[in-house]
Every structure is written in C-alpha cells, then in structure tokens.
C-alpha cells in the first residue's frame, strides 16, 4: 500500500512539472528557419518533399502540409491536408499533429505565445 501511494505521489509530482501545450507562433520565419520546420514536418508525414499551405506561422499558430499533387493519370485525389498546431511547452517549441496529437520538437526554433499578440 505504501508503495502504491509513493508511486502515485511521484507520478503526480512529475506530471505537475510539465505544462500543457499552449498555442504559439514562430519568432523567425527566415528561409533557414522554415527549412528546419519543413524538414521536421516532412519527417512527421513520412514524405521526402512537402509543400506548406498558405498562412504565416509568425502570426498564426497553425501550419498546414498540403497533400501530394495528383499524378498525370489521376483526375483528382481524396487526400486531405495535414494540420499541425505550433505549441509551446516548458519553453520549447513543437508542432502537434492535430488529428493524432503527436508532438514533434522543433530543434533550435524559437516560439512565443500566440496570446502575446
């Protein structure tokens, strides 16, 4: 019984240290920064090359990865864009896949709270 109480206390203490993700925007959208973001997103959707949808990640906390273009023999494609939310958690910048909730760390990328606008 003591072990169970100690385990619950320890887990509660550890989870209290971690903040919930909050909406964020990128501080810098230079070509170098966007190249890093694009490579993280490409790995997240498991594609070598991606095209980002419209929007300004320095103003909006969302980045959209467009689906691959239909091939020459395809009339249309049922593929949908993949939406990622830019989030700040414990001072670090991540993109969170909206449908699955999976988080991807943006190494070396600086974000700020979206509510600071």
Q: Language-model segments: which ranges?
A:
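Bacterial N-terminal signal peptides that target proteins for export
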Residues: 1-6
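C-terminal motif of bacterial Sec signal peptides marking the signal peptidase cleavage site
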Residues: 13-16
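Bacterial signal peptide processing site
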Residues: 18-20
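Second-shell loop/turn segments in exported
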Residues: 23-28, 83
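Mature extracytoplasmic domains of secretory-pathway proteins
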Residues: 31-92
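C-terminal partner/receptor-binding element of secreted or periplasmic proteins
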Residues: 90, 99-117
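Short linear proline/tyrosine/threonine-rich motifs used for host-factor recruitment
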Residues: 95-97
């Amino acid at each position: 019984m003591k072990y169970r109480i100690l385990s619950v206390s320890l887990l509660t203490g550890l989870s209290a240290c971690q903040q919930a993700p909050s909406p964020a925007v990128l501080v810098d959208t230079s070509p170098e920064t966007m190249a890093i973001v694009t490579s993280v997103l490409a790995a997240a959707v498991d594609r070598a090359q991606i095209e980002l949808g419209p929007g300004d990640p320095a103003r909006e906390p969302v980045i959209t990865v467009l689906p691959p273009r239909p091939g020459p023999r395809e009339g249309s494609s049922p593929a949908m864009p993949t939406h990622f939310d830019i989030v700040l958690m414990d001072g670090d910048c991540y993109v969170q896949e909206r449908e699955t909730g999976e988080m991807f760390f943006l190494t070396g990328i600086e974000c700020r709270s979206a509510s600071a606008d």
